[in-house]
Amino acid sequence: MTEEFNESMINDIKEGDKVTGEVQQVEDKQVVVHINGGKFNGIIPISQLSTHHIENPSEVVKQGDEIEAYVTKIEVDEENDSGVYILSKRQLETEKSYEYLQEKLDNDEIIEAKVTEVVKGGLVVDVGQRGFVPASLISTDFIEDFSVFDGQTIRIKVEELDPENNRVILSRKAVEQAENDVKKASLLESLNAGDVIKGKVARLTNFGAFVDIGGVDGLVHVSELSHEHVDSPEDVVSVGQEVDVKVKSVEKDAERISLSIKDTLPTPFESIKGQFHEDDVIEGKVVRLANFGAFVEIAPGVQGLVHISEIAHEHIGTPGEKLEPGQQVNVKILGIDEENERISLSIKATLPKEDVVESDDATTQSYLSNDSIEDNPTLGDVFGDKFKDLKF
């Protein structure tokens, strides 16, 4: 009965079967295995011992090890009643690896793997077999030199499996994106308008700067970069620069965060505190004209108002009669309102009063400058016979 059973097992072993056995001998280029229930011994060539490259079979097996493998070929010498099973342990390992990776792909799970090689197009990793992380799937950020990952254990997700073509595509970027999504949701919940936090400039555009505030980018509009006018964001900040930002608004549904660098900086008015005082006479530049007066810049970003009545001693209809933008003028500080950050200025107070009257009529000048009424000429003296033909 026992002999019939064993004979049946022997006859049932065929190519493609999975068998078990014990390592009997480890040679330079192959391993000899006693197959359980087999008529012959099995041979595993070094190329079929592992999914990894090895120089010697002793790197992965030793005598007495129990192993499992696929029968890839049966060579029989009927004349001598002998033969050998050609086995592949690598094929079995690859199959198990694909089963494991498929499960991780189906469940969108993260796995850890060691980077075994850095190549031009990405990273080669060990996931029980050769896996590949393309350059485009390495990170959400730009990485110039991939060699920093060489030998490192990284967290990845399975992106694509193709057993027929022995193709395993993995993504480290997907893990970062998932982590960033969690961070973003948490940050959006915790942020409030008015919060002042630290960040790092991530990228620049024509309309502002995006600042990373902990895995989430917020926008600092160009108008919020400085108290002064900014033509280009790169004139004020640079990528990688650490900055303090104030949260202006948080749109949780749209996942948008508006930030300000300007609001964390001293205002131009605060920066001149103690520098100017009432009655000081200083130089400034006319920057803008309005119907009611002229705005004069007395320090970078600091403007004061010269009311139209303080432009000249004589009456003028519009500031444009005496001033133009860009003109340098002397002004006297009439008052400083620190609470409202306003400065009242006067040009008139810096001008001598004798400069007020401008006339080429010598007689009129004489009339205005003479204190003696008796010595003053009459209208008749001034205009002579010019009234004689007038009829009243």
Curated annotation (Swiss-Prot):
Species whose genome carries this gene: Staphylococcus haemolyticus (strain JCSC1435)
Taxonomic superkingdom: Bacteria
Taxonomic lineage from the root: Bacteria, Bacillati, Bacillota, Bacilli, Bacillales
Pfam families: S1
One of the record's GO molecular function terms: structural constituent of ribosome
A single Gene Ontology CC term: cytosolic small ribosomal subunit
Protein name (record): Small ribosomal subunit protein bS1
Family from the record: Belongs to the bacterial ribosomal protein bS1 family.
Domain S1 motif: 16-90, 108-173, 194-262, 279-348
UniProt function note: Binds mRNA; thus facilitating recognition of the initiation point. It is needed to translate mRNA with a short Shine-Dalgarno (SD) purine-rich sequence.
Keywords: Repeat, Ribonucleoprotein, Ribosomal protein, RNA-binding
SUPFAM superfamilies to which the protein is assigned, alphabetical: Nucleic acid-binding proteins
One GO-annotated biological process of the protein: translation
Presence of keyword ATP-binding: no
